[in-house]
């Protein structure tokens, strides 16, 4: 089992980046972002280094799943209030692991459950549509910069 858990040959890709400038403001869409030990520069949740929810990531495929549940053609990633949309790698399999995006290293700390804002942003049923599809949270281990199109790689020696 340990060998199976350590096998992550897939390399993901950053599809979208957004920061939350202030409470209840729309996310600001970015092509690249600077990351300090306190979080994403420009994000309102940037703060104390080492916090478990400094960065949020969501699976690109989950946008399609949530849209399908809500009978929508598509969903604007900004409505989901997550920082990074990733394709090509299973984020849920990365819990307690470190990932590298550009020269930034993050440690995936846990699930990112939906908040009541999902009902407001997505309409009636939005909260329940997001359950089990809300993505993951991460803390910053190494600061740097990354952009849309950059690879998302699991660092294999990082299981906690």
For the regions a language model picked out, list residue spans one by one.
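Metal-cofactor-dependent catalytic cores
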Residues: 1-160
């Amino acid at each position: 089992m340990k060998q199976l858990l350590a096998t992550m040959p897939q390399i993901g890709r950053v599809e979208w980046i957004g920061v939350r400038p202030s409470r209840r403001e729309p996310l600001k869409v970015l092509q690249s972002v600077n990351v300090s030990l306190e979080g994403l520069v420009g994000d309102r949740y940037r703060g104390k280094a080492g916090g478990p929810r400094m960065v949020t990531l969501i699976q690109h495929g989950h946008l399609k799943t949530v849209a399908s549940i809500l009978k929508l053609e598509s969903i604007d990633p900004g409505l989901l209030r997550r920082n990074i949309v990733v394709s090509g790698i299973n984020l849920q399999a990365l819990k307690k692991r470190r990932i590298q995006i550009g020269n930034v290293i993050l440690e995936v700390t846990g699930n990112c459950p939906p908040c009541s804002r999902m009902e407001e942003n997505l309409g009636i049923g939005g909260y329940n549509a997001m359950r089990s599809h809300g993505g993951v949270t991460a803390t910053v281990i190494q600061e740097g910069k990354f952009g849309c199109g950059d690879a998302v790689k699991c660092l294999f020696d990082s299981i906690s």
